[in-house]
Amino acid sequence: MNKLAILTDYFGDIILVQFEYFRPQSEIRKLVSSYYNVTVSDDVSDVMRAEIANLRFVIAGQVSADLNGAEEQYGPGDTLLCGPTYRWSHVRFTPGTQVFGAAITPMGWARLFDVDADQLADRLVPLEAYVEPSTLPLIQDILDAPDETQRVTAADRLFTAMVDPARRIDEEFLDQVTAWIASPEPNELAVLISEMSRSQRQIERLCKKYFGSAPKLLHRKFRALHSANRLTWQDLTDWRDIATTVYSDQSHFIREFKQFNGRTPSEFIKGAHILVRMTLQQRLQIDHESPFSLIG
């Protein structure tokens, strides 16, 4: 059953949003850790925070986003590959818009796409340009599915077909960095380097390849996302409860928080944040094979 949220915008007007998460089939959960479906009944404008890589299938309506530097519109049938993002962006939905999405883990990116993650970081691109022609009918099956149960099944078929088991992947590195990011405080970069039998140059190169950025930026991003998650999941009303000593001062914390979440901590607590708040709440409703889709 869809989660129906009755929310209000800054002007007190009621906005209806349906949001639900789904688990992919077990064989691909390390690659695609969750699916989601969102439907909005009215015009909705919001800020999207920095995210992990994902796919978005526009089922109905129209979505506008400025992640690529200028506002672009996407309509029914558009399928978008979004690399890992390291900054916030604006998004807007017209009434009746429905979007189906999939969260892609770093392992999933390596198995599914023949392009380094940093090449598509902070970018929205057509999915069709990065998949084999033989998979295009499977993409259409997702768009044409009559309900969410069949859409999830169609998505499972698509991602299963996209997997390249022969591709060489440094799974040990992926696991080590994932564990580091899952709890980034107080695990600074020096901690990661000290625990790996690799040079700093190797770590930088592999982080860009699999995670979309150098480790320092990756750490800053997830530290800020963790802070926002705690505000939501613990229902905190004072941002100072999550401002830890790893920041040089309060101004540093506020700047970092806003860079990746799109709002200051106080604005995050008091503002509408329809999409971010709903996604964070709904993520807790399913188990996540990878902590990446839960945190980011």
Regions found by a protein language model. Give the residues of each.
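Alpha-helical bundle regulatory/interaction domains
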Residues: 1-190, 195-200, 213-214, 229-232, ...
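HTH DNA-binding helix-turn interface
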Residues: 206-215, 257-265
